[in-house]
Amino acid sequence: MASPPRGWGCGELLLPFMLLGTLCEPGSGQIRYSMPEELDKGSFVGNIAKDLGLEPQELAQRGVRIVSRGRTQLFALNPRSGSLVTAGRIDREELCAQSPLCVVNFNILVENKMKIYGVEVEIIDINDNFPRFRDEELKVKVNENAAAGTRLVLPFARDADVGVNSLRSYQLSSNLHFSLDVVIGTDGQKYPELVLEQPLDREKETVHDLLLTALDGGDPVLSGTTHIRVTVLDANDNAPLFTPSEYSVSVPENIPVGTRLLMLTATDPDEGINGKLTYSFRNEEEKISETFQLDSNLGEISTLQSLDYEESRFYLMEVVAQDGGALVASAKVVVTVQDVNDNAPEVILTSLTSSLSEDCLPGTVIALFSVHDGDSGENGEIACSIPRNLPFKLEKSVDNYYHLVTTRDLDREETSDYNITLTVMDHGTPPLSTESHIPLKVADVNDNPPNFPQASYSTSVPENNPRGVSIFSVTAHDPDSGDNARVTYSLAEDTFQGAPLSSYVSINSDTGVLYALRSFDYEQLRDLQLWVTASDSGNPPLSSNVSLSLFVLDQNDNTPEILYPALPTDGSTGVELAPRSAEPGYLVTKVVAVDKDSGQNAWLSYRLLKASEPGLFAVGLHTGEVRTARALLDRDALKQSLVVAVEDHGQPPLSATVTVTVAVADRIPDILADLGSIKTPIDPEDLDLTLYLVVAVAAVSCVFLAFVIVLLVLRLRRWHKSRLLQAEGSRLAGVPASHFVGVDGVRAFLQTYSHEVSLTADSRKSHLIFPQPNYADTLLSEESCEKSEPLLMSDKVDANKEERRVQQAPPNTDWRFSQAQRPGTSGSQNGDDTGTWPNNQFDTEMLQAMILASASEAADGSSTLGGGAGTMGLSARYGPQFTLQHVPDYRQNVYIPGSNATLTNAAGKRDGKAPAGGNGNKKKSGKKEKK
């Protein structure tokens, strides 16, 4: 059998086939190429980059790749040249068998555009296969009495090539008895038959050897041969006969294995062994013998395995009936396989985007997929669908490819991920369907600012809070995810009371907890207005603000402060006066107190905590007024000591106490006589302070005395010189020496400083007052100096006292008290100028000293008798009324339960000046002395 080389003739056909490979139609979305089979791996098929409108280097950048369904990749892309090349040798006969047109379809995917192009490559057949008989030798039997024209069926040859390269003709070697006739069957196959031309004579020649040659139409021509041995038999008059000679049957592809398809019947009129027929497949192919079974006695054809329409749509076979005399008859059988909807549609995902940003535009491609159904006709028609309530749709692409695209904007906060159910269904009966799930995550975009649950917040913190204590917590929610939802908190920059807001409070940037950076004082700070900003960590970040009102709650941290009577600072005791003639309810004094707190913590109540004479005095609960509870009796002591407690209404309540000393007397001498017995407890620390003050005053006094002595000496020397000059010059009579130094010079010095001895309840302890401006020009006169000069004539005090006892001068009318200055119930009693007031020189001088001390105290705001400025240490009724000029104004915090009165600041009572009438009287006294 001839077997020419496979590559023979291929080189001559390569050039025209390469030219065919450049044919394409890029404008239609379907690219077509042609190429010959059996090219080497990497052979050029077409310039795919050019046909796609791309540069070669863009193939990799754009993700261009080949996609095909369930088939070994026959082609590849050359990224350097942009060409479509073969991935290996392509055998057309293996790929397409006897199909006259061999076309390979696949798709080119441009990944970044989610666009797909169809590519069709036609494989051109070359003459690389020679005709081939199944058997190299065939034995044929024929009766010797066979008539001329008897036909014997010969085996036919097969050529895997198609077209002009397929089988064209047969040739029979030359002989005397037989000729060759070629019959074309209904399937287009050429069947050779041996025709008897001359009668046979078994006795002359028993065996005839012939050579049958099959030729194709290629160039060069390829051929195949088989050897035929014809054996001459004795006579068999009748040959078998099929009626009809061709059989056809259609069966569904899903018939069970072993199903009988049809029964062939042949007849032979001979008898005996010559009439017994046996059936067999002629030229039995392996595929036929594996699929079908032929009963050799009955001629019944049945299935050996399942039929598959998608694998083979029909089967062509030839059945031979042979009798015992070697006569045969043949019949052709065509089994057509009918398609059954037994294949569910198939979904093949070609490209998929697993995550999509929520700000993508409508029409964005999510996935590219293809569908396939192995059935045909309506059974192979496919419909695709997805749920209607999703923001997606399907768009048909080339062939059976579809795009899954968005139809509207996506919102991750509404739906963060989708599981898209893709349903493909064929049109068969019953229809078959397949579901495929396409997952899609929606990537977050920072499109939502943090959101506070409330438009504003308010909270409170008690004053005196510890530093670093947690005040409040705010929380904002961001519906985004990841960094876009990570919220940080901050406070808006601001200043309060000259200090940055960040020095008052801070906020934890992660938790939103506010902390106090200082201890708040309600009396200084009552509320703070803050703006809290919540910002996410997106790009760009989004933020929102909320207002926070922080209120400081008052705590009862301030004890009541007693304004009147003022607490003494020098150990002296203030004295209030109550006449023995006072009736019950007589107003002795009023305790005035304030509390820096507010509200209930500032409500004050007064009570008498302790009294030397219980039941004699009562204190108003809400007013603080000290009044007599009963009439004063003679047996009541001159000095009454009251301890008044002032208490607020806080929790727990705080209180303060003050000791009020009340002098019970109708006359000043009675008061003065007992002043020495009024003492106040002295703190040891006050004694130390007093000692230091005494030492300091003593030192200053020594310096002052030295200066005065030097001044007096100078004055005496000047005066002595002037007297000598007068004696020598004018010889005038001498003037007697005065007992005093010149008062004019001393008074000039006293205009600057003076030392005073204060008569207080503790006068026996020699309290001294610091140097202060002198009021000698208004309180002293030359006459008073002649009467008593304690600074110059201290050694003559006792003599002067004794002289005054003997020679009592008439009282000085300049020191007589006016009606407004006399004791009484705050000027409520009338009387004349000559009352029970000082009627001797001793009383007058005592009152002068007291007035001098009071005037000095009024100048510096001190009080030696505890009565306050300008009170002479007696009572507010005997001097200027109590003023609040040196006290902080807390009147807005004072609430007096049970009374509508509020504290006022009367300008007329704050100047602390003595009555004008007193000063005028002193000036008149000076004029009299000058006269």
Curated annotation (Swiss-Prot):
Residues 30-133, 134-242, 243-347, 348-452, 453-562, 570-683 form the Cadherin domain. CDD domains: Cadherin_repeat. Glycans are attached at N419, N545. Residues 921-931 have a biased composition (Basic residues). Residues 714-931 are cytoplasmic. This is Protocadherin gamma-A5. SUPFAM superfamilies: Cadherin-like. Residues 1-29 form the signal peptide. PROSITE patterns: CADHERIN_1, CADHERIN_2. Residues 809-840 have a biased composition (Polar residues). GO terms for biological process: cell adhesion; homophilic cell adhesion via plasma membrane adhesion molecules; nervous system development. Residues 800-840, 901-931 are annotated as: Disordered. Pfam families: Cadherin, Cadherin_2, Cadherin_C_2, Cadherin_tail.
